[in-house]
Amino acid sequence: MAQGRRVERVAALIRKETSELLINGIRDERVHKGMVSITSVEVAGDLQHCKIFVSIFGEPNDQNEVMEGLEAASGFLRGELGRRLQMRRAPEVKFQLDRGLEKGTSVLGLLNQLEDQRQERGEIPPGSDELQPD
């Protein structure tokens, strides 16, 4: 059980430090082409590998460039994490694009379209919050 808590603690620290490095430490211009948010961090039980899930707000071409920049900076990031977290061996860092926010926005758009169609047909009165959660 202590192993699980340690992994969670390391993941939280990696998320915090990576966020700071995205703002102040990484100089690659590709990384700053879109708004980058770290959505989650998964660390292997042996602390040798970690996956950093990022959400990138911007055009698809910009998203690809940002991902290339992040991958290029992963070696620098690994060294900085090792230094800042005082780990003997910092985990190998991999970035993965998290499309959860895009999917959520898409679902909300579909729900809004459905509500508009139902209002046009007179099934629900305008301004009704029938589709809104309680």
Curated annotation (Swiss-Prot):
Superkingdom classification of source: Bacteria
One GO BP: maturation of SSU-rRNA
Keywords: Cytoplasm, Ribosome biogenesis
Positions of region (Disordered): 115-134
Matching PANTHER family: RIBOSOME-BINDING FACTOR A, CHLOROPLASTIC-RELATED
HAMAP family: RbfA
Protein name according to UniProt: Ribosome-binding factor A
